[in-house]
UniProtKB/Swiss-Prot annotation:
Gene3D superfamilies reported for this sequence: P-loop containing nucleotide triphosphate hydrolases
Residue ranges crossing the lipid bilayer per the database entry: none
Subunit structure: Homodimer.
Designated name of the protein: Thymidine kinase
MF GO annotations: ATP binding; thymidine kinase activity
GO annotation, biological process: DNA biosynthetic process; TMP biosynthetic process
Organism (species): Equine herpesvirus 4 (strain 1942)
Active site positions, chain numbering: 60
Encoding gene, per UniProt annotation: TK
Length: 352
């Protein structure tokens, strides 16, 4: 975490009463498949003060997952799949345990989002506005509530029921959110995973392939919504998601980012499954409401892609080059100071 909130005495009104000093904030969520290098990129951005403005970095909540409670979530979710594959755990039981672990991944992100979202400010500014403060979050809650659960569902590790339960917990994003989905060629991605050798983490090529596809779906979903379309546009013509769809979604780079995506390129397509439809093939209203909510929660996210194939400093520069295209919000000095305190606390408590 780099420099603190811009110093300075709060301005005063004509009567001499202190007024609330305004602070322009750009917030960035670095996201993508695990092991690409986003955490290193975020730390470098904070240490170098991206774009010349003070930068606060909120890391992955690793301690929350690994040491604060009785079970290591990262080791646990991989161990569950191993036990299932070895025949030591029934498929249905494994799915329930996987859903439990996945919900624990999301808890600290939801807590952090709830704590910080009221501090961002409500007024969205013109893109390209020079920020007084840059916030870099290591993942958005969409990762643990939508993307990773969707991948687990496509792999057969979680049920649609569990996926819907997770998706429903995604918080609505206030105006001004910017998510950067990080990418990397497969060979370098695997090399970096082997180099970091995180305890309990496994290099699961099929999971990696599925996550890559799901993140392309996320990018396409944000583009789709930004174009003014809704999930009902083309729903009737969309084929029902079936075993062939799931198989395709587990193949390396079967999905790609589309500038003008169709509904079938988005996350919404995987929800057109018999489990959510009535006997006529019509989606039940309660499930339609869930997709309406997902649409509204994602609508305020501006999505970008960034290739992290360079050095850490080069990767940070790639993300920083997107700053002029990003949305910002107008907050105040007290809120900015509260964000700085939150970042310091989160860094101190979440490190392992």
């Amino acid at each position: 975490m780099a420099a603190c909130v811009p110093p300075g005495e709060a301005p005063r009104s004509a009567s001499g009463t202190p007024t609330r000093r305004q602070v322009t904030i750009v917030r960035i969520y670095l996201d993508g498949v695990y092991g690409i290098g986003k955490s290193t990129t975020g730390r470098v951005m904070a240490s170098a003060a991206s774009g010349g403005s003070p930068t606060l970095y909120f890391p992955e909540p690793m301690a929350y997952w690994r040491t604060l409670f009785e079970t290591d979530v990262i080791s646990g979710i991989y161990d569950t799949q191993n036990r299932k594959q070895q025949g030591n755990l029934a498929v249905d039981d494994a799915a329930l345990i996987t859903a439990h672990y996945q919900s624990r991944f999301t808890t600290p992100y939801l807590i952090l989002h709830d704590h910080t979202c009221t501090l961002f400010g409500g007024n969205s500014l013109q893109r390209g506005t020079q920020p007084d403060l840059t916030l870099v979050f290591d993942r958005h809650p969409v990762a643990s509530t939508v993307c990773f659960p969707a991948a687990r569902y496509l792999l057969g590790d979680m049920s649609m029921c569990a996926l819907m339960a997770m998706v429903a917990t995604l918080p609505r994003e206030p105006q001004g959110g910017n998510i950067v989905v990080t990418t990397l060629n497969v060979e370098e991605h695997i090399r970096r995973l082997r180099t970091r050798a995180r305890i309990g983490e496994q290099i699961d090529i099929t999971l990696i392939a599925t996550l890559r596809n799901v993140y392309f779906m996320l990018v396409n979903t944000c583009h789709f919504l930004r174009s003014g379309r809704v999930w009902r546009d083309g729903w009737g013509e969309l084929p029902t998601s079936c075993g062939a769809y799931k198989h395709r979604a587990t193949q390396m780079d079967a999905f790609q980012e589309r500038v003008s995506p169709e509904l079938g390129d988005t996350l919404f397509a995987l929800f057109k499954t018999q489990e959510l439809l009535d006997d006529r093939g019509v989606i039940l209203e309660v499930h339609a409401w869930a997709l309406d909510a997902l649409m509204l929660k994602l609508r305020n996210l501006n999505v970008f892609s960034a290739d992290l194939s360079g050095t850490p400093r080069q990767c940070a520069a790639v993300v920083e080059s997107l700053l002029p295209l990003m949305s910002s919000t107008l907050s105040d000095f007290d809120s900015a100071s509260a964000l700085e305190r939150a970042a310091r606390t989160f860094n101190a408590e979440m490190g392992v």
